[in-house]
């Protein structure tokens, strides 16, 4: 192996196979853009985002790690969310859960 070299398997890599997903319509009712990262607990996003918040509890965006979705002021779009895996405990973010989901 050469330092810094990547050894990637050929073919496509499927993300979050077998996990529950939902699609929600999300609108930015604020006057500034809002960006949400791939692993941010969607339930705890900025209050200027309007959507079925209760349905998003325990879920994150179903996008590749280290990417994000940006919502411009007045913009509305559908996003796909996926269940958190593992122990399903959430700490930090906006502090709305701080424990088991």
From Swiss-Prot:
Pfam families: Urease_beta (PF00699)
UniProt superkingdom: Bacteria
One example of a Gene Ontology biological process annotation: urea catabolic process
This protein's record includes keyword Cell membrane: no
Gene Ontology MF annotations: urease activity
Keywords associated with the record: Cytoplasm, Hydrolase
Main subcellular location of this protein, as a coarse class: cytoplasm
Metabolic or biological pathway: Nitrogen metabolism; urea degradation; CO(2) and NH(3) from urea (urease route): step 1/1
Protein's UniProt keywords contain rRNA-binding: no
Enzyme class: hydrolase
The protein's Enzyme Commission number: 3.5.1.5
Reactions it catalyzes: urea + 2 H2O + H(+) = hydrogencarbonate + 2 NH4(+)
GO (cellular component) term, any one: urease complex
Compartment(s) where it occurs, according to its Swiss-Prot or TrEMBL record: Cytoplasm
Self-association state and partner proteins as the record states: Heterotrimer of UreA (gamma), UreB (beta) and UreC (alpha) subunits. Three heterotrimers associate to form the active enzyme.
UniProt family annotation: Belongs to the urease beta subunit family.
Family matches, as PANTHER family: UREASE
Protein name (Swiss-Prot/TrEMBL): Urease subunit beta
Organism: Pseudomonas fluorescens (strain Pf0-1)
